[in-house]
Amino acid sequence: MRAIMGCRPAFFLVCAFSVCAQVQPPATRQDNVSETFHGVEIVDPYHWLEDQSNGETRAWIDRQNAYAHALLDGLPVRVGISQRLTAMLRHDQVGGPELRGGYYFFEKRGAEEELWSIYRRKATGGPDELLIDPAPLSADHRTSVGMEEISEDGNLLAYSVRQGGEDETEIHIFDVRKRQDAGKPLPRALYQGFAWKADANGFYYTLGKRDAGRRLYYHALVPGGGTDMEVFGEGFGPDTWIAPVTSPNGHYLLIVVQHGWAKGELYFQDLSGSGPPRPLITGIDARFDPQFAGDFLLVKTNWKAPKGRVLKIDLRDLGQEKWREVVAAGDDAIDDFAVIGGKLFVNRLHNVASRISIYSLDGAALGEVALPGPGSGGMYGRADQDEGLLYFSSYTTPYSLYRYNASTGARTLWHRNAVPFESERFETEQVWYPSKDGTRIPMFLIHRKGLRPDGQTPTILYGYGGFNVSITPFFNPQAAWWIEHGGIYAVANIRGGGEFGEEWHRAGMLDKKQNVFDDFIAAAEWLIQKRYTNPRKLAIWGGSNGGLLVGAVLTQRPELFQAVVCWHPDLDMVRYYKYTKNNNPPALLEYGNAAIAEQFKYLYAYSPYERVRPGTKYPAVLFTSGDADTRVPPEQARKMTARLQAATNSDRPVMILYDTKAGHSGGTPLSKVIEDSTLELAFVAWQLGVQ
């Protein structure tokens, strides 16, 4: 039943806002540092908060956390949210099985466990065998492990060890037969790619340095270690990713080079010879995503096909004139693809829902893979294995994973998240609305069946809009709680993502980024115009690049929203390029670089931190960030919190929840995930009057 403002909710709000009135945000000192960018003087009143190790900054973080908890911990709705999220998250979860040496290797988190562990299971069936347990590594469960790659024979497992949520890890090699680590680990660093040689006598890995870029190394497994050899990367800058892929037959090393999110290159090396890696695909302004099939490469690309196509390349007979198109571009964008056994599985997005088509490796159409319904599906596997995996989820269907036989099409359930949720009570509708420039944008609305718009329904609007990321339907426990309590959960598939191909992506990057914000604002206006909700009942939610989205929108149209959740955001787009200790150089190819005069103009025009105006009635805002975010600079959230607290002229609170061990790369124990998710949802429920 929807919690509309009656006596009890009204009493709840009066009490909550009374607490807000009594508890005021901590004052923050201003230092007003002035810088000039291309003739424009910019004054930063909270520049000092960029120094993360400074004692004054640490004290500021403590005071801000105390303020946020003083407002949030006592909310009556918090207890019920915590109980419900616990019920929806405390179940066995499995991720990413990979078949090697007759065993499936996978990550698993048991219902009562805090972190993911690494297991294996015989492909023919049997019990799960625990290989790597992170529990003994730290008393507070903030040290986690992750599966990197398994050798072809299944005897050696590379796994990462991560502190908190930082991107940096150690890389360990685990001897599966001896049940112990083999040799010394690679020390803590920014590793961003790993591949075993087929004979398991060594491996390739990518080592990243934020100032110098990535380099590919080869590590031989010899007694006493030895010196790792640099294989590739000289001349590439910090705005480039490099990742190795070895062919299952042991013949080839493929090197994938990615320049931001819009351009890629491929290099390869014949491992039977002694020559260095040589160019395969270079100098083309498009992406190339490869998979091996024996001596062939199947490559998904948007070259001359903005919505994607698949090419076939014979590595024994090179030359662009020899490339063959095996899957042509169509009306729907190709999201991903898999080569399993002797077949090609192509996942297209039809109005943002998955449709998986089957082809021979020469492009003959062989039918489709039936999915449980509209939602997000996908497949993965290898060309030399007849069995792959199929997954599916939707906004009202929890995640399921199936073993899939490529020869017969037979599937068997591997795992289903046992979430207690009554899917049949709810429905998902897709609507289309015009953006500012007339572009039609799709949006999913998830709510209880039979909802009649009356302008009063509490609504959360979510978006991302960037980096070619497609926001496809997936089950979200926070959204599930929201719709169970009568709300609408809305997801706008705005430009900048990959839902409709590369043109959709590029229409939301660099100097076109304002399109993303306009699309999101138009979604809010449409929801209000069509009487689904009103500004006092509307919250927006986004993280990372989506944090930039909601940060920009709240500064451009603050009157449209009651509340904002802004998770680990990018916000100071003028100084962003100066944050060299964070993983920002590739993102400059998506956002732009304020050191370049032409790009400074549009970055300065929308940069949320520079757009804050004193005396404005801003919505309630909850920021989240943490010291361990080594990808999105946390100083941005710190500075934005202080600036909005000083500027706002409304009675709605601005606060930050700052976890010193939190970052972009997960590693958070489940109890902390539930705690953080509860506080975020309680904040929105409080502001929108939901119990």
PLM features per residue range, with description:
Residues V491-Q691:
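Active-site-proximal cap/loop segments of hydrolase catalytic domains
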Residues G102, D153-N155, D199-N201, N249-H251, ...:
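Short coil/turn segments that connect the beta-strands within blades of beta-propeller domains
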Residues A135-S151, Y159-E166, R177-Q180, G319, ...:
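Cap/lid segment of the alpha/beta-hydrolase catalytic domain
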Residues L131-P134, V176-P187, P223-G235, S272-I281, ...:
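Blade-edge beta-strand/turn elements of extracellular beta-propeller
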Residues R120-R121, H172-D175, Y217-P223, Y267-L271, ...:
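Beta-propeller blade signature
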Residues G55-E149, S160, D239-F292, D336, ...:
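Non-catalytic accessory segments flanking enzyme active sites
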Residues D128-M147, A158-V161, G165-L207, G213-Y217, ...:
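Asp-box/WD-like beta-propeller blade repeats and closely related beta-sheet repeat scaffolds
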Residues R214, Y218-V257:
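Polar, glycine-rich mid-to-C-terminal structural blocks
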